[in-house]
């Protein structure tokens, strides 16, 4: 009777030694993984929207390079501003994804003490051809987020 009780007691004593709290490095790695997953989900939403609207395949657009968290967040804010369109509600899911992605990037940046630029001012303008503008904006978002997969190591730098 004492032997099983002693084994249970010994297992409780060794439990805290075998499980360690998450380190800052582990938390950063998990956050980067979550950011990349959300970016991939956003790209999937873009492709689904493109199929629903029978849009042409994506065009090649040059987007700024991802240098670190600050530059990534700044361009995400710019894209978020472009996605907030008074003309259509079709982009609301993608806009919500980009906004959420920026929130995750901001959170990671605060953990790493990164300096962030203020949000760029939104340009409120009516486009002569809003559908073309939406197509162009979606292509920019898709291209930028696809480049994140190749540059995920830049998310560990301010």
UniProtKB/Swiss-Prot annotation:
Coiled-coil annotated spans: none
Disulfide bonds: 114-158
Known function: May function as part of a signaling pathway that acts to regulate the size of the body fat depot.
Signal peptide: 1-19
Highest taxon in the source lineage: Eukaryota
Name of this protein: Leptin-B
KW Disulfide bond (keyword) present: yes
Main localization of the protein described in the UniProt heading: secreted
Disulfide bond listed as a keyword: yes
Localization (cell): Secreted
The entry's keywords: Disulfide bond, Secreted, Signal
GO cellular component: extracellular region
Family: Belongs to the leptin family.
Tissue distribution of the protein: Highly expressed in the brain and eye. Expressed at low levels in muscle and skin.
């Amino acid at each position: 009777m004492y032997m099983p009780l002693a084994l249970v007691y010994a297992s409780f004593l060794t439990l805290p030694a075998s499980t360690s709290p998450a380190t800052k490095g582990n938390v950063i790695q998990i956050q980067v993984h979550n950011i990349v997953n959300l970016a991939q989900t956003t790209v999937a939403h873009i492709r689904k929207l493109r199929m629903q609207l029978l849009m042409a395949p994506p065009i090649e657009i040059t987007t700024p390079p991802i240098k670190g968290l600050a530059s990534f967040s700044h361009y995400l804010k710019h894209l978020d501003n472009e996605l907030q369109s008074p003309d259509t509600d079709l982009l609301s899911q993608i806009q919500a994804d980009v906004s959420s992605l920026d929130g995750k990037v901001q959170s990671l940046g605060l953990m790493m003490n990164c300096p962030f630029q203020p949000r760029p001012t939104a340009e409120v303008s009516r486009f002569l051809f809003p559908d073309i503008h939406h197509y162009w904006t979606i292509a920019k978002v898709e291209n930028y987020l696809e480049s994140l997969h190749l540059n995920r190591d830049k998310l560990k730098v301010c």
